[in-house]
Amino acid sequence: MSHGGGGHAAELFPENQVLVIGAVLSLIGMYIAHFVPSLAMLLGGLLAAGACVAGANTTRRVAAYGLGTGVPSIGMVSLGMGTISALAGVLIPSVLAGSVALPFDLVLATPIIAAVVAIIVGFIVGKLTQNPVGMKVPIIVSSMTKLSLMGALAILGFCTAFAGGFSADLIINGAINNGIIALAFIAAGMSILHPFNACIGPNESHKRTITLATACGLMAWLVFSIAKLDIVSILVAAVFWIYTYGSFVSMSLADACEVKYVPELPKKE
């Protein structure tokens, strides 16, 4: 049943479980991309899609409280918070390395630092939406925190996959100066906001929404693979996306009470 008429079906997968899986997969993907650059796009890009799926799942839950047109907006807020946090995670180690003597390479903690900053930023933004903004959604603080985290992991995950690592020099030259971070913002943002926005309604199904979220995450990976001109990743991502999106279409046709196909447009009035 929906909260506030938002069109939210019963949960098949616990939100926190999806969140943990998405976060762990994206973190693993970033470390693979950093230590094995030859597999950066193939595995790093694939696993970055996990953050998109988890973010889309959280969007589904918070949007069920009747956000209406706020469904796309909250996705953009997620990536706004995520971008700030990802950049902070990349730059903080390089700044501290020049001023503080540490017994280990702080660069290796970049994804973790980005995640911590994202949680803090999301919590603050969530509190601000309660006061002074005045939103009455009871889970808004926790949801903003989770969306900020998933936004940061998605942004940093795809940028790391493209750049071949998450050190400041690699990200700045391989993802920021060339504008790839803007592509990450749009691709990951659409993957997080679109699934529930497309499936919302009285017949919304958690399984169908998650399937579309997976397809959107895989499409983001495909877009990055094409931008990188990584042939193997392009082929694998295309196969995965076609299969997943085909599954979503099949579910939609099966769940629909009636399917009407658009006829051929008349050649004359």
UniProtKB/Swiss-Prot annotation:
<comment type="pathway">
    <text>One-carbon metabolism; methanogenesis from CO(2); methyl-coenzyme M from 5,10-methylene-5,6,7,8-tetrahydromethanopterin: step 2/2.</text>
</comment>
<feature type="transmembrane region" description="Helical">
    <location>
        <begin position="84"/>
        <end position="104"/>
    </location>
</feature>
<keyword id="KW-0812">Transmembrane</keyword>
<keyword id="KW-0484">Methanogenesis</keyword>
<feature type="transmembrane region" description="Helical">
    <location>
        <begin position="152"/>
        <end position="172"/>
    </location>
</feature>
<keyword id="KW-1278">Translocase</keyword>
<dbReference type="GO" id="GO:0032259">
    <property type="term" value="P:methylation"/>
</dbReference>
<keyword id="KW-0472">Membrane</keyword>
<keyword id="KW-0554">One-carbon metabolism</keyword>
<feature type="transmembrane region" description="Helical">
    <location>
        <begin position="106"/>
        <end position="126"/>
    </location>
</feature>
<feature type="transmembrane region" description="Helical">
    <location>
        <begin position="222"/>
        <end position="242"/>
    </location>
</feature>
<comment type="subunit">
    <text>The complex is composed of 8 subunits; MtrA, MtrB, MtrC, MtrD, MtrE, MtrF, MtrG and MtrH.</text>
</comment>
<keyword id="KW-1133">Transmembrane helix</keyword>
<dbReference type="GO" id="GO:0030269">
    <property type="term" value="F:tetrahydromethanopterin S-methyltransferase activity"/>
</dbReference>
<feature type="transmembrane region" description="Helical">
    <location>
        <begin position="62"/>
        <end position="82"/>
    </location>
</feature>
<feature type="transmembrane region" description="Helical">
    <location>
        <begin position="18"/>
        <end position="38"/>
    </location>
</feature>
<dbReference type="Pfam" id="PF04211">
    <property type="entry name" value="MtrC"/>
</dbReference>
<feature type="transmembrane region" description="Helical">
    <location>
        <begin position="180"/>
        <end position="200"/>
    </location>
</feature>
<dbReference type="InterPro" id="IPR005865">
    <property type="entry name" value="THM_MeTrfase_su_C"/>
</dbReference>
<comment type="function">
    <text>Part of a complex that catalyzes the formation of methyl-coenzyme M and tetrahydromethanopterin from coenzyme M and methyl-tetrahydromethanopterin. This is an energy-conserving, sodium-ion translocating step.</text>
</comment>
<comment type="similarity">
    <text>Belongs to the MtrC family.</text>
</comment>
<keyword id="KW-0808">Transferase</keyword>
<protein>
    <recommendedName>
        <fullName>Tetrahydromethanopterin S-methyltransferase subunit C</fullName>
        <ecNumber>7.2.1.4</ecNumber>
    </recommendedName>
</protein>
<dbReference type="GO" id="GO:0006730">
    <property type="term" value="P:one-carbon metabolic process"/>
</dbReference>
<keyword id="KW-1003">Cell membrane</keyword>
<dbReference type="GO" id="GO:0005886">
    <property type="term" value="C:plasma membrane"/>
</dbReference>
<dbReference type="GO" id="GO:0019386">
    <property type="term" value="P:methanogenesis, from carbon dioxide"/>
</dbReference>
<keyword id="KW-0489">Methyltransferase</keyword>
<feature type="transmembrane region" description="Helical">
    <location>
        <begin position="39"/>
        <end position="59"/>
    </location>
</feature>
